[in-house]
Amino acid sequence: MIERPSTDSGQATEVACLADPVPAHPLLDGLTEIGRGESSIVLASRDDKHVFKVVSSPADYFYLAADDRPTGIHFPHLFADHGIVGKASNGYSFRLLEIERLLPLAGEAAELGRMLVNAYWEGCEKWANMGVNRGRLALYHIAQDPPAGLPASLVKAVAALSDFIEEYPVQPDLLNPGNLMMRGDGTLVLSDPVFLP
């Protein structure tokens, strides 16, 4: 059974981080690492608006860079795909993406994030007998019957994410801390909501 993350205590569930070093690339020389996840490394760019994200998971690459990826106000903006920059220890290629800089959730975005995570968790519990497909069903049902108070733009984003997941060999992950972030203006962003099963 999956463990429900604490959304109120401020304590994040521990996430295994990619152990690989930052790959050598001229665009990354001298940049500061600001984040690391299960399959990615984030480095600050020379301005406050962009970051460089080195991804080793095809799921992350599809989500952030595919031509038919979901787009809109609740999805990260891709500025450039700089291609393959090495090979990760997991066997996949490292790809270098330049995306918008996002921030940890706070204020109203944090409240919307909690609402979305709670609805997703409830759906996962409801559809637990569906095994690995429970997350897909939970997402689909949020789009079809959203919780009260979820803005129409976020419902539309959840529907777009649900459609994307049906087309790619990925599963949704809204429970992992850091998969929901926000822009400086407070807009909730589905920053990294997919993984390879």
List PLM regions with ranges:
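Juxta-kinase regulatory segment immediately upstream of eukaryotic protein kinase catalytic domains
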Residues: 1-31, 145-152
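ATP-binding glycine-rich loop module of kinase domains
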Residues: 28-92
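Conserved hydrophobic "DFG−1" position in protein kinase catalytic cores
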Residues: 44, 98-101, 182
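Protein kinase-like catalytic core scaffold
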Residues: 50, 74-77, 95-97, 169, ...
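Active-site ExK catalytic segment of metal-dependent nucleases
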Residues: 51-58, 100-102, 192-194
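Conserved structural core of kinase catalytic domains
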Residues: 76-154
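Acidic, glycine-rich flexible loop segments
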Residues: 152-165
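Catalytic activation segment of kinase domains across protein kinase-like and atypical kinase folds
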Residues: 164-197
